[in-house]
């Protein structure tokens, strides 16, 4: 493990938070949110490579965290990274397996390591980001792996808050750019004509949920299904985004089985296909949960779908970030 790099003005603080997978979009948003808290919450960001560390080193000085490079599967390295921290936020995870990145390593192994590290370091709580539908008994390899990771945390010594979320969308992020591209398409092929239900949550709301997990006392050993306030078919979601531009794409219905078959073939003939059958199954799964229990438990507000689209996809959002 590389030793943490201390940003200017860094201070030791009992409320320090270890964030794993901190170089991703959610991690960077969380770092900024905590840095701008009153008082600021110091963050130690754990990443797995020097290249990932460079992403965080490029952040503005006033929000730049301590940075350390670790092996997410190494409990000893994570325990050292967690020294002097009170909480950990575990954001490590993948949707698509590759030849060098497997579900077992990204989910179960990394979660087992952070659980062991948290016990060694005496952390107060781990906040874990999971996926709606995660279940050890799932027939989907990704959701089953996530479900096993959840169980590791529930069985661990350190209390955990598990947040299961659907699609997360924020200004300027990859998801927002994909939705914008689809909304502006003249013709858009969608599995089953876009009948699968989606329930996107605003990235800022998720960040507030994670922050609540670092601030509230009544969130130990909980699994919360957290989603946006509205569930609707994918087709309607894209059409609503398109209306912000006075557009309406022509939806071309493609049989779901055919899409999954093609994805399966791609896995057989390419070492790193753009999408896999397993990842597609997660993307096409129906997201339709009641977010109110989680919202109330966390004490947060949820941004309406129309406001999400305005901020992330609408004409005023296209130049952001």
Predicted features and spans:
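N-terminal Rossmann NAD(P)H-binding glycine-rich loop of SDR-like oxidoreductase domains
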Residues: 9-40
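A short helix->loop->beta-strand "cap" motif at the edges of active sites that frequently abuts
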Residues: 121-125, 158
């Amino acid at each position: 493990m590389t030793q943490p790099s201390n940003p200017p003005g860094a201070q030791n603080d009992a409320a320090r938070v270890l964030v794993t997978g901190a170089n991703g979009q959610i991690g960077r948003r969380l770092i900024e949110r905590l840095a701008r808290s009153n008082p600021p919450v110091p963050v130690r960001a754990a990443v797995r490579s020097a290249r990932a560390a460079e992403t965080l080193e490029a952040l503005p000085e006033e929000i730049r965290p301590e940075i350390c490079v670790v092996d997410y599967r190494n409990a000893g390295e994570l325990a050292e990274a967690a020294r002097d921290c009170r909480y950990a936020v575990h954001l490590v995870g993948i949707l698509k397996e590759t030849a060098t990145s497997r579900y077992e390593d990204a989910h179960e192994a990394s979660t087992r390591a952070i659980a062991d590290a948290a016990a060694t370091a005496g952390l107060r709580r781990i906040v874990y980001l999971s996926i709606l539908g995660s279940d050890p008994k799932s027939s989907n390899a990704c959701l089953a792996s996530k479900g096993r990771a959840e169980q590791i945390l529930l069985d661990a010594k350190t209390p955990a808050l598990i947040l299961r979320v659907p699609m997360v969308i924020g200004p300027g992020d990859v998801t927002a750019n994909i939705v914008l591209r689809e909304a502006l398409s003249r013709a858009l092929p969608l599995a089953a004509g876009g009948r699968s239900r989606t329930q996107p949550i605003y990235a800022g709301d998720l960040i507030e949920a994670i922050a609540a997990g670092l601030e509230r006392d009544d969130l130990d050993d909980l699994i919360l299904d957290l989603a946006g306030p509205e569930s609707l078919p994918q087709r309607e979601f894209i059409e609503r985004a398109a209306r912000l531009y006075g557009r309406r794409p022509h939806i071309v219905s493609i049989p779901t089985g055919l899409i999954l078959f093609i994805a399966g073939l791609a896995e057989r003939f390419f070492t790193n296909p753009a999408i896999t059958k397993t990842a597609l199954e997660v993307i096409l799964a129906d997201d339709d949960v009641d977010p109110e229990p989680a919202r109330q438990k966390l004490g947060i507000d949820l941004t309406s779908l129309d406001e999400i689209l305005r901020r992330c996809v609408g004409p005023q959002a296209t130049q952001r970030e």
